[in-house]
């Protein structure tokens, strides 16, 4: 009994300690801002997880689109780099970082909910089903995907990607607004020049890819053409 109580107190003490700010560094850096940045780290890592899953899907022998696989592998790495940049930034400001689990199904469902919201600006994607994500996840996302031949092509994946990038961008814009409300000039500057600039560029590039794919006739040959062109994600801005 005493050992259990000691362990419980030790865990609670550890959690409390982990949430301490670094007083010698922290200045004009609020708890609510730190919490938002922690949440954004989770969202960046969730996006990375989705992209890694998509990369593995396009590497399958019955899909075999190496160019698109490479696109998603690089996109996954880019999102992880963004998460690391946020971690570095929190530490630079004297903040603290706690981590939560990442569930692929939950991550995909969050994007789906964003797409169907009034603020997404993606009315044409209201029937987004994230079928590839559901195919590679351990838990079923929905039962409305039908035959795999209907959604296994690259166009669907890039439409999913546009939704994900716009979701991440919306979260960054929300953090920027709250940072501005708190008069945190340093954070608003970092968000504008190192994160939002990159997101806008990525969204534009993905939109071009979708337009190009839609202009092709449906078929794996045209997906292969896009794969050979290889639409590389926008290079990471140095943080």
UniProtKB/Swiss-Prot annotation:
Binding residue positions for Fe cation 1: 44, 79
Chain intervals for the UniProt region annotation (Insertion): 105-146
Acetylation keyword on record: no
Tissue specificity field: Midgut gland and bloodstream.
Subcellular localization, as worded in the UniProt entry: Secreted
GO CC entries: cytoplasm; extracellular region
GO biological process: intracellular iron ion homeostasis; iron ion transport
Keywords per UniProt: Iron, Iron storage, Metal-binding, Oxidoreductase, Secreted, Signal
Source organism superkingdom: Eukaryota
One Pfam family here: Ferritin
CDD domains: Euk_Ferritin
Main location: secreted
Annotated GO MF terms: ferric iron binding; ferrous iron binding; ferroxidase activity
Recorded family membership: Belongs to the ferritin family.
Record text on subunit structure and interactions: Oligomer of 12 or 24 subunits. The functional molecule is roughly spherical and contains a central cavity into which the polymeric ferric iron core is deposited.
PANTHER family: FERRITIN (PTHR11431:SF75)
Name recorded for this polypeptide: Yolk ferritin
Organismal lineage: Eukaryota, Metazoa, Spiralia, Lophotrochozoa, Mollusca
């Amino acid at each position: 009994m005493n050992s259990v109580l000691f362990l419980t107190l030790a865990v609670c003490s550890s959690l409390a300690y982990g949430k301490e700010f670094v007083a010698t560094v922290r200045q004009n850096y609020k708890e609510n801002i730190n919490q938002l940045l922690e949440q954004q780290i989770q969202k960046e890592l969730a996006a990375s997880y989705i992209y890694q899953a998509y990369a593995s899907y396009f590497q399958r022998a019955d899909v075999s689109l190496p160019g698109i696989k490479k696109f998603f592998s690089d996109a996954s790495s880019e999102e992880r780099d963004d998460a690391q940049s946020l971690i570095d930034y929190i530490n630079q400001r004297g903040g603290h970082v706690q981590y939560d689990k990442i569930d692929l199904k939950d991550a995909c469902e969050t994007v789906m909910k964003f797409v169907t919201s009034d603020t997404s600006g993606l009315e044409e994607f209201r029937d987004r089903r994230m079928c590839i994500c559901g195919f590679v996840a351990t838990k079923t996302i929905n039962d409305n995907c039908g035959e795999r031949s209907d959604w296994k092509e690259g166009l669907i994946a890039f439409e999913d990607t546009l939704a994900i990038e716009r979701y991440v961008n919306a979260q960054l814009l929300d953090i920027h607004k709250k940072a501005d409300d708190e008069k945190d000039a340093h954070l608003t500057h970092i968000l504008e020049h190192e994160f939002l600039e990159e997101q806008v560029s990525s969204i534009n590039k993905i939109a071009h890819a979708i337009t190009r794919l839609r202009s092709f006739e449906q078929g794996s040959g045209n997906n292969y053409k896009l794969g050979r062109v290889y639409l590389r994600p926008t290079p990471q801005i140095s943080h």
